[in-house]
């Protein structure tokens, strides 16, 4: 019950920040073009700092085993999501089904999951959720691009800022090399920008969307798959495997987001 209250409060906070973005866009104080520039800042700086910060911890056996379990769960959940989208969203003459499949598989977990996890299970949740985000990025840049009809560029995938930040984080975690306090503080401050700025940007983009889309049965179906089918399947599988609560929370929260 306490976790539900904490999550509800955190979701309300996130909606308030989204509302700020919507308000500022309607008042012509933040344009969509400016929001796109902020997106670049998030993807190339703030989110990598969140990932690196999650690895700034002592190396313990329980962290290693937990991270390994989180990797296995993340891989299995993405495979299931891809298969479910292929099965539930059938090809049509128009190309819209490609976007629907992509939307059913890939959430906004890279930005929205971390504040929810930090509020419910602490920094450990963020650490284990990093495993999910790694596979999210890998699948998105390979399967996601193919679904949308594009071609995969291994070089772009390899030099993705989030992939590079995971490599840096793992290096720091396994070597336990000391990080200067000013650098640690800078990473922490930049990572703190991730959630509020991403919510404001979301509000800016929502301000330009027509409400008529809510009457589109295909969009509603895609949203139901994304927000109901995927999380419920994740909960069922993880509980059937008897995973600890802190392992369950991270992937389920990541899967449940829009």
PLM region spans:
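Alpha-helical transmembrane segments of multi-pass small-molecule/ion transporters
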Residues: 1-258
């Amino acid at each position: 019950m306490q976790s539900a209250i904490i999550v509800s409060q955190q979701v309300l906070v996130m909606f308030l920040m989204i509302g700020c973005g919507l308000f500022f866009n309607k008042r012509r104080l933040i344009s969509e073009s400016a929001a796109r520039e902020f997106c670049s800042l998030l993807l190339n700086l703030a989110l990598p700092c969140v990932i690196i910060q999650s690895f700034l911890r002592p190396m313990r056996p329980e962290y290693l085993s937990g991270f390994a379990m989180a990797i296995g769960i993340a891989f299995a959940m993405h495979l299931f999501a891809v298969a479910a989208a292929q099965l539930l969203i059938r090809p049509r003459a128009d190309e819209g089904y490609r976007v629907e499949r992509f939307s059913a598989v890939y959430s906004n977990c890279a930005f929205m999951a971390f504040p929810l996890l930090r509020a419910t299970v602490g920094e450990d949740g963020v650490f284990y959720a990093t495993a999910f985000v790694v596979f999210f990025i890998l699948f998105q840049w390979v399967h996601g691009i193919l679904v949308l009809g594009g071609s995969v560029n291994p070089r772009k995938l390899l030099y993705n800022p989030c992939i590079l930040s995971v490599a840096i984080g793992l290096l720091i975690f396994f070597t336990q090399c000391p990080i200067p306090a000013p650098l640690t503080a800078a990473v922490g401050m930049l990572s703190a920008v991730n959630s509020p700025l991403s919510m404001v940007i979301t509000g800016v983009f929502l301000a330009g969307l027509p409400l008529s889309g809510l009457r589109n049965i295909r969009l509603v179906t895609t949203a139901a798959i994304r927000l109901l089918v995927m999380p419920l399947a994740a909960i069922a599988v993880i509980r059937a495997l008897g995973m600890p609560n802190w392992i369950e929370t991270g992937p389920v929260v990541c899967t449940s987001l829009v």
